[in-house]
Amino acid sequence: DLKDKKPKNLGENWVAPNAVIIGDVTLEKNSSVWFNATLRGDIENIHLGEGSNVQDGSVLHTDPGYPLKIGKNVTIGHLVMLHGCTIDDNSLIGIGAVVLNKAKIGKNCIIGAKSLITENKEIPDNSLVMGSPGKIIRQLTDDEIEAVKQNAIRYQENLSLIHI
């Protein structure tokens, strides 16, 4: 029942005119939701952290007992599917990746394009993960961690350039 579930905007952010956000969804400041993305908080809460972005065509959803939490400065790439999972701060989820219920992605991670993170899988901080099912390839370098952070910052800076 969506009657009591309404999106909450906790600061300046940007949502594309054709993005869909329904139900119990929280958008922190400097976050952005891009074209054709869908955030369905009709079952559990979806929380998009400060400075995080959800790119074009991505779908975020939940199941009973499995809310979806995205930390600060996270980049959710194009056509990503997130379902009832946790993505910690300063991580990047690559184009077309899928992360399922109760999976937890640590801080400063890169989940490669088209990777599948199965239910209940925990990825430790600073990991590069690729494949289906996703396997830890190696630890990220300091330069790679900084590049992920800078990617999220570029999306935040773009918010001031958008004209509708």
Predicted regions and their residues:
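C-terminal end-helix/capping segment
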Residues: 138-141
